[in-house]
Amino acid sequence: MKVIFLQDVKGKGKKGEVKNVADGYAHNFLIKKGLAVEATSANISALEGQKKKEKKEAAEELKSAKELKKQLEEITVELSAKSGEGGRLFGSVTSKQIADALQKGHQLKVDKRKIELNDAIRSLGYTNVPVKLHPEVQATLKVHVKEQS
């Protein structure tokens, strides 16, 4: 019996795959537990429609990530912090602070987890910070930390 997998089933198939399995296994386990549906022509066309929709959404996501990259690379995020001798900060500037500054100063919402700050910024001056917006799109954000008055 041909079935369309709705979820990954270890050793049998991945979500969205159409496979031939034993009738009893299909009826008594896969379909009963909601892991698969019978591969009728209506179900197959619905699956194809869903795949097209997912592909379109992925393309839109990539396009918006590229637009955001363009915006991020044109701006400089200004932050102020208390510092001691030699421009060393008391504490550090974190990815959360950078994300908040982007939200407040430039109305750009970037998840703090996408800001790839290996080590927190601990000194005054300019720092280039990589931002991974999408698996295929990475921007470089300029962050300027200045003395707090």
From Swiss-Prot:
Record keywords, A-Z: Ribonucleoprotein, Ribosomal protein, RNA-binding, rRNA-binding
Domain of life: Bacteria
Keyword rRNA-binding: yes
UniProt GO cellular component terms: ribonucleoprotein complex; ribosome
Gene Ontology biological-process entries: translation
InterPro entries with a match to the protein in the record: Ribosomal_bL9, Ribosomal_bL9/RNase_H1_N, Ribosomal_bL9_bac/chp, Ribosomal_bL9_C, Ribosomal_bL9_C_sf, Ribosomal_bL9_N, Ribosomal_bL9_N_sf
GO molecular function: rRNA binding; structural constituent of ribosome
Primary role: Binds to the 23S rRNA.
HAMAP family: Ribosomal_bL9
Family: Belongs to the bacterial ribosomal protein bL9 family.
Protein's recorded name: Large ribosomal subunit protein bL9
Organism (species): Bacillus licheniformis (strain ATCC 14580 / DSM 13 / JCM 2505 / CCUG 7422 / NBRC 12200 / NCIMB 9375 / NCTC 10341 / NRRL NRS-1264 / Gibson 46)
Lineage: Bacteria, Bacillati, Bacillota, Bacilli, Bacillales
Recorded name of the encoding gene: rplI
